[in-house]
Amino acid sequence: MKNSRNIVALICILLVVISGMIAVSAADIAFSTESLEQEEIETILSNINITKLSNEPSKKVIQCFSVNTDGTIAVGCGSYNKKTVCIYNSEGIFQYGYSFQTAGSFGIELKEDILYIYFVRSDIALAIDPDGQINSVTRIQNTIENNSYWNHSVFSTKISTEQYEYVIKNNLGIFNVFASSYSLLTKTDVYGNETVIYDVNNTQQFRVYSTLFFIVVFLSIGVYTLFFRLRKSRL
């Protein structure tokens, strides 16, 4: 009888410990997620091909960003299917980063020393530590709450902490409306003093102006062709 009680007590303790572990795991990510089969996880990781970076890659326009409670900053960049996330300290000095492959958009969150990468097209949430080890790969559920979190948290252009307000933005004047990414990351203290942490404004200007140039050329060719055909039909 005594052994039976000990076994029951041990089972209860294990259940409490496991429940606590599950609660902590769920608290690490704000999205509600579901587990994946190991074979599917391996396929995802093979396709993404995530690699740790020890040297800072060339800076590109900002797709997304996140700020940790200690002021550590994660900046997500990329073009086409090659993406990077670079980790900077509070002064904007590069620490380490990751490169990976994905054709769609992505968002990031930095919680303590764990980086969460959220893939929009596949609804995958990936957690990776500073050593480049994958902690988890789960699927983000399609819920109203998750959709709201995508829009208002993951892809927010402003993050506020106790000491600073971090903002990603452009400095292109009236041409800001043509930019789908961001060229500046700034932090502003409680006294209104602004510090630029990340700046690729010249790159963004070239991208936007080049796009506008090709749009104008395309429209001009279209208008000229239409005018030529109308004139020809009247002859």
Regions picked out by a protein language model, each given a short descriptive name:
Residues 1:
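Acidic, glycine/polar-enriched metal-coordinating patches/loops
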